[in-house]
From Swiss-Prot:
Name used for this protein in its record: Large ribosomal subunit protein uL10
Family matches, as InterPro entries: Ribosomal_uL10, Ribosomal_uL10-like_sf, Ribosomal_uL10_bac, Ribosomal_uL10_bac_type
Gene Ontology MF terms in the entry: large ribosomal subunit rRNA binding
Organism listed in the record: Methylibium petroleiphilum (strain ATCC BAA-1232 / LMG 22953 / PM1)
Record field: transmembrane: none
Keywords of the record: Ribonucleoprotein, Ribosomal protein, RNA-binding, rRNA-binding
Alphabetical list of PANTHER family matching this protein: 39S RIBOSOMAL PROTEIN L10, MITOCHONDRIAL
Domain of life: Bacteria
Assembly information from the UniProt record: Part of the ribosomal stalk of the 50S ribosomal subunit. The N-terminus interacts with L11 and the large rRNA to form the base of the stalk. The C-terminus forms an elongated spine to which L12 dimers bind in a sequential fashion forming a multimeric L10(L12)X complex.
GO cellular component: ribonucleoprotein complex; ribosome
Role description: Forms part of the ribosomal stalk, playing a central role in the interaction of the ribosome with GTP-bound translation factors.
Length: 174
């Protein structure tokens, strides 16, 4: 079923709105996927905040024209599903994780920070931990020296025969 001009303009406007908010674009060929598999992929994408859309490639090229994702326009050929995400790694991660379990979904290309990515680049981007994981790792690194100092002070207080609360006061007096 073909779309008339107004419907095409509406689709391009809708996708352009998602593109404007996105940091990452991931393209994958879905040839041979069943409807059930596509629905499962869409469900996973919704849970991760990824906008997935099957588009005509010409409409996708129009939607990304003038954006940082225009560099991926050369890769837009064949039956593709487009994944856009505000999180830097979410789109790549959702598509790569699904492709691991289903050989019919083939990662083709992507774009991040104005640079075109090949399939290996998208897989590398997908292997980066999410922002939340990176922040928790950073917090753990920052808390590690503080907790070590607290343990040393507690051990020092035990050696001197005092309480753990007295150790910081003694250390400050010294």
């Amino acid at each position: 079923m073909s779309l008339n001009r107004n419907e095409k303009e509406a689709v391009v406007a809708q996708v352009s709105a998602q593109v404007a908010k996105a940091q990452t674009l991931a393209l994958a060929e879905y040839r041979g996927l069943t409807v059930e598999h596509l629905n499962a992929l869409r469900k996973q994408a919704r849970e991760k905040g990824v906008y997935l859309h099957v588009l005509k490639n010409t409409l996708a090229r129009r939607a990304v024209a003038g954006t940082s994702f225009e560099v991926a326009a050369g890769s837009m050929a064949g039956p593709l599903i487009y994944g856009f995400s505000e999180d830097a790694v979410a789109a790549a991660k959702v598509i790569a994780d699904f492709a691991k379990g289903n050989d019919k979904l083939v990662i083709k290309a992507g774009a991040y920070a104005g640079k075109a990515l090949d399939a290996e680049g998208v897989k590398a981007l997908a292997s980066i931990p999410s922002k939340e994981v990176l922040l928790s790792q950073l917090l753990g690194l920052m808390q590690s020296p503080v907790s070590r100092i607290a343990r040393v002070l507690a051990a020092l207080a035990e050696q001197r025969g005092g309480s753990a609360e007295a150790a910081p006061a003694e250390a400050a007096a010294a």
